[in-house]
UniProtKB/Swiss-Prot annotation:
NCBIfam families: met_syn_B12ind, PRK05222.1. Binds 1 zinc ion per subunit. 5-methyltetrahydropteroyltri-L-glutamate binds at R16, E17, L18, K19, K121, R524, C525, W570, E614. Its EC number is 2.1.1.14. The active site is at H703. PANTHER family: 5-METHYLTETRAHYDROPTEROYLTRIGLUTAMATE--HOMOCYSTEINE METHYLTRANSFERASE. Zn(2+) binds at H650, C652, E674, C735. GO terms for molecular function: 5-methyltetrahydropteroyltriglutamate-homocysteine S-methyltransferase activity; zinc ion binding. It comes from Burkholderia orbicola (strain MC0-3). Its cofactor is Zn(2+). The lineage of its organism: Bacteria, Pseudomonadati, Pseudomonadota, Betaproteobacteria, Burkholderiales. This is 5-methyltetrahydropteroyltriglutamate--homocysteine methyltransferase.
Length: 764
């Protein structure tokens, strides 16, 4: 019999209950006990949703991040919070979010009382994790309370529980040494704590533990490979069964290593590594379980179940009880329930599967393998009809778009003149001071903005009323920026629900959901639009709003667009053509918007590519192909304008030291980047690479409520000036200010502008 299980379930709730619960708690509007009760209720509901599985995950629920949870389980707390003796949950949030100082003395140590932990992308997804911090003298100590609490809840509910933990080698690999120490040198101290954790779970009657080691799908040197052998030899003596889980890619040169580790089962991502199944069957010891991720855990398209059974049936005959079935990875990366999508186009809806529907697909596959296809004939027929409908739909294929793609040539991606000539023309037109100040685009999405949007969508506010409300918010943003004496202004994006969904709603070839939310980090959720067909732009999307904002001020107003690579990487993308083709289609559509903004008199146009690095394949050998079409797509978008129109781009969480040449090749006049959480570490790339254009290193972390001091910002900019000529530096926050409150934004930007003025005086 085939065993079914799941690697993880979305934790936010079908209606984002966790997000709203967290925000109430952080604002002091609910108690700690109420938040913990909400967590328990979500876990209860999610285990009920997974009741048909043979094994359901526990430990996948986190109030902020599963990697941060593992740090607390291992007793690896940053030194700056180790002396805090209050509630563990509050300490947890101190690491996740930081805490502003209450006094000048606290400010002296940092930009606030407690600095937030560094946050970065979880492999090549749009989820972010809190980076574990290590020092040469780091010690570990077991705190299993979180897992034991969830295990007790699951047992009481009758769940056949499979605890999920992050493996020791991946945990070290994901972290960062805060001194010059070697992370792997900590492995001997870490392994006994893992052993104690497994012993603790064994004592609770747990049979299987899922231990995630996704770095096995990346390129590993000999030292890291040896770390796997050492780690699992040490854990082999435990009496508990280990399912080693890999996902997000192929094992490739790590296949033999993964197959040889002394564990009881191996999970692979059979969406990406389907070609490796036969080799694994040959290499795995005869008694070992092979779990195949046959349902895509990262996209929302229905699985072709009949096609999946065509290759699973021979495998089931070969492996028998040793075959397990699961999604390819945790379902954290997809929305919860398609059944909520009552307003989604019925035809498009028939092509989709969210987390609950993927579990239904898993059940159909397992039933067909265990009892024969006839047992689920109706479900298989319905699935086949949906797959065929999508394949044949004229809504998916637009001949005019395909013809435009065929006409793309190199000239489309080139500016008229090189940067040095453009810079002088832009300087004359914009007349900006040294260290010009700007923000990245969005200002706080206030309750009034959200209420107006909600009323408009519900039909309670007409279009004229909605436009008036948004114009009032735009005017407020402009007046605040003028009062702050910022140099290049933004309109604040009051009218935008999301930097990608806003555009997806206005492009042909896109559909959008009501409740298709996925977690990005903490309480931050995004609702990726659904790219189902060929992309085109029926009409201008932003010109009216930007032109109105520009009419309110004589200062330059940035046109704000999301770039094609980011729209692609933050969408649920069609899987029936190469991603590069979809990206070129987006580039042509956004290019039309860029040219319309320029015609409307907009002098500065920002094209955000926040997710450029996110699309990089996990293996470096595959980078060049991705970067080629990603950079080409940006250049097609940006390079139709005149020399005196200044093109900006923004990248967040982009550890781009290793792709700096490609970023330079994008040829944006100004790039703004996230650097504050890494203390300008991202600028190390400029020690050896002479970036030719202008750059704005982010000077304060907008993901934390901390208010940076003027001196702190000046210090960061001085570090930047050691690498970038002062005349090419801008001063700006790390990212957009949408998630902050005006009470936080005004003092932070006041200090930022004051810092820029101080720098100008020092330069003069």
């Amino acid at each position: 019999m085939v065993t079914t299980h799941n690697l993880g379930f979305p934790r936010i709730g079908a209606k984002r209950e966790l997000k709203f619960g967290l925000e109430r708690y952080w604002k002091g509007e609910s108690s700690r006990d109420e938040l913990k009760a909400l967590g328990a209720e979500l876990r209860r509901r999610h285990w009920h949703d997974q009741r048909d599985l043979d094994l359901a995950p526990i430990g996948d629920f986190a109030f902020y991040d599963q990697v941060l949870d593992m740090s607390f389980t291992l007793g690896n707390l940053p030194k700056r919070v180790q002396d805090f003796h209050g509630d563990a949950l509050d300490n947890y949030f101190r690491v996740a979010r930081g805490r502003s100082a209450q006094s000048a003395e606290e400010h002296a140590a940092c930009c606030g009382g407690v600095a937030a932990g560094e946050m970065t992308k979880w492999f090549d997804t749009n989820y972010h994790y809190i980076v574990p911090e290590f020092h040469a003298d780091t010690n570990f100590s077991l705190d299993p309370s979180r897992l034991l609490q969830q295990l007790a809840e699951a047992n009481a509910q009758g769940v056949n529980a499979k605890p999920v933990i992050l493996g020791p080698v991946t945990y070290l690999w994901l972290g960062k040494a805060k001194d010059d120490s070697d992370r792997l040198a900590l492995l001997p101290k870490l392994l006994p704590v893992y052993g104690a954790l497994l012993d603790t779970l064994t004592a609770q009657g747990v049979e299987w533990v899922q231990i995630d080691e996704p770095i096995l799908v990346t390129e590993l040197d000999a030292e890291w490979r040896q770390a796997f052998r050492i780690a699992y030899a040490a854990l082999e003596t435990r009496r508990i069964k280990l399912l080693l889980a890999t996902y997000f890619g192929q094992l490739q040169d790590n296949l033999t290593l993964a197959a040889s580790l002394p564990v009881d089962g191996l999970h692979i991502d059979a969406i990406n590594a389907r070609d490796e199944v036969d080799a694994l069957v040959r290499e795995l010891p005869a008694e070992r379980v092979l779990s195949v991720g046959a349902i895509n855990g990262r996209n929302i398209w229905k699985t072709d179940l009949n096609a999946a059974l065509d290759w699973l049936e021979p495998l089931a005959k070969q492996l028998g009880d040793r075959l397990w079935l699961a999604p390819s990875c945790s379902l954290l990366h997809v929305p919860v329930d398609l059944a909520s999508e009552e307003k989604l186009d019925a035809e498009i809806r028939s092509w989709l599967a969210f987390a609950l529907q993927k579990l239904d697909e898993l059940k159909v596959l397992a039933t067909a393998l265990n009892e024969g296809r006839d047992k689920v004939a109706d479900a298989l027929a319905a699935n086949a009809a949906a797959i065929d409908s999508r394949r044949r739909s004229p809504r998916v294929n637009n001949p005019a778009v395909k013809a435009a793609i065929a006409r793309i040539d190199a000239r489309l991606g080139n500016r008229t003149s090189p940067y040095t000539q453009r810079a002088s023309k832009q300087s004359a037109r914009l007349n900006l001071p040294a260290f010009p100040t700007t923000t990245i685009g969005s200002f706080p999405q206030t309750a009034e903005i959200r209420q107006a949007r909600s009323r408009f969508k519900a039909g309670a506010l007409d279009e004229a009323g909605y436009r008036k409300a948004m114009q009032a918010e735009i005017e407020r943003s402009v007046r605040e920026q003028e009062s702050l004496e910022l140099d290049v202004l933004v309109h604040g994006e009051a009218e935008r629900n999301d930097m990608v969904e806003y555009f997806g709603e206005q492009l042909d070839g896109y559909a959008f959901s009501q409740f298709g939310w996925v977690q990005s980090y903490g309480s931050r959720c995004v609702k990726p639009p659904i790219l189902f067909g060929d992309i085109s732009r029926p009409k201008a999307m932003t010109v009216e709003w930007i032109a109105y904002a520009q009419s309110l001020t004589r200062k330059p107003m940035k046109g704000m667009l999301t770039g094609p690579v980011t729209i692609l990487n933050w969408s649920f993308v069609r899987d029936d053509q190469p991603r590069a083709v979809s990206c070129y289609q987006l580039a042509l559509a956004i290019r039309e918007e860029v040219l319309d903004l320029e015609k409307a008199g907009v002098r500065v146009i920002q094209i955000d590519e926040a997710a450029l690095r996110e699309g990089l394949p996990l293996r470096r050998a595959q980078w060049s192909e991705y970067l080629k079409w990603a950079v080409e797509s940006f250049r097609i978008t940006a390079n139709g304008v005149q020399d005196d129109t200044q093109i900006h781009t923004h990248m967040c969480y982009s550890e781009f030291n290793d792709i700096i040449a490609s970023i330079a090749d994008m040829d944006a006049d100004v790039i703004t980047i996230e650097t504050s959480r890494s203390d300008m570490e991202l600028l190390d790339a400029f020690d050896t690479f002479k970036y030719p254009n202008e750059i704005g290193p982010g000077v304060y972390d907008i993901h934390s409520p901390n208010i940076p001091t003027q001196d702190h910002i000046v210090g960061l900019m001085r570090k930047a000036a050691e690498r970038i000529p002062a005349e090419r530096l801008w001063v700006n926050p790390d990212c957009g200010l949408k998630t902050r409150q005006w009470a936080e934004v005004i003092p932070a930007l006041t200090n930022m502008v004051a810092a820029a003025k101080m720098l100008r005086n020092q330069v003069q």
